[in-house]
Amino acid sequence: SLKFVYAIILLLSLFLLSMGNIPLVPCETDDDCPMEMSIPSIPNKLLFFMCWEKECVYRRW
């Protein structure tokens, strides 16, 4: 039963890691992200792109 719990925790953590698997785009020269950034499977209304450590990362609302 303990192995089952560990297996579920492992699967959940792998799922959460795969959700954030979006290729990073370098920031523009003005420390902003390109306007044409979009992810086909997620509506743009739910995402907010921001420049962090010279790469564009997304945050969900």
UniProtKB/Swiss-Prot annotation:
In the UniProt record, the signal sequence range is 1-20
Give the keywords, sorted: Metal-binding, Nodulation, Signal
Protein's GO biological process: nodulation
Instruction: Enumerate the Pfam families for this protein.
Output: Nodulin_late
Give the residue spans that cross the bilayer: none
Q: Which InterPro entries match?
A: Nodulin_late_dom (IPR009810)
Gene Ontology molecular function = metal ion binding
The keyword Signal belongs to this UniProt entry's keyword annotation: yes
What else does UniProt say about it?
Answer: Contains 4 cysteines arranged in two pairs in such a way that they might be capable of binding a metal ion.
Protein name per Swiss-Prot or TrEMBL? Nodulin-14
What's the encoding gene here?
A: ENOD14
